[in-house]
């Protein structure tokens, strides 16, 4: 993981989805591209959080294709390594999970549906 907030190209749909009642905030790319077998996600744990977060990439059937490690507040991860190649247009789910820092109890999860948007030119 890297410190701070990333500088993300506009075409990757980087945003901060938030649902009422969530105990943490995060940012992630809605338009996921592939770079050498890795998904470009820019998962960012907001600086004001206390929760640790991680991201799983799932296929349409819920099978896990890859996941990040735990990311601390004010850190981000650009890539998630994938277990298989995903062609452009493949439907995927990004599952973001939060954990309380001392107990590792769940701090809630959010799932975003998206598709692979092609090869990264980053």
Task: Name the predicted role of every residue range.
Residues 1-34, 115-121:
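Transition segment at domain starts
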Residues 76-84:
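Exposed aromatic-hydrophobic patches
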Residues 63-75:
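Solvent-exposed serine/threonine-rich low-complexity stretches and specific carbohydrate-binding patches
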Residues 42-47:
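Asparagine-centered strand-capping/turn motif at beta-strand->loop junctions
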Residues 88-100:
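Short, aromatic- and glycine-rich surface loops/edge beta-strands on solvent-exposed regions
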Residues 102-110:
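Beta-sandwich strand segments
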Residues 54-58:
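Beta-strand signatures of extracellular beta-sandwich domains
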Residues 37-41:
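Structural beta-strand segments of beta-rich domains
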């Amino acid at each position: 993981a890297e410190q701070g907030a990333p500088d993300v190209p506009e075409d990757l749909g980087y945003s901060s989805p938030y649902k009422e009642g969530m105990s943490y905030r995060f940012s992630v790319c809605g338009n996921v591209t592939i770079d050498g077998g890795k998904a470009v996600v820019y998962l960012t744990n907001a600086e004001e959080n206390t929760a640790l977060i991680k991201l799983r990439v799932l296929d349409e059937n819920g099978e896990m294709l890859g996941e990040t490690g735990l990311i601390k507040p004010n850190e981000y991860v650009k890539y998630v390594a994938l277990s298989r190649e995903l062609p452009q247009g493949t439907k995927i789910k990004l599952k973001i999970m939060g954990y309380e820092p001392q107990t590792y109890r769940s701090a809630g999860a959010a799932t975003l549906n998206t598709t692979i948007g092609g090869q990264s030119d980053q």
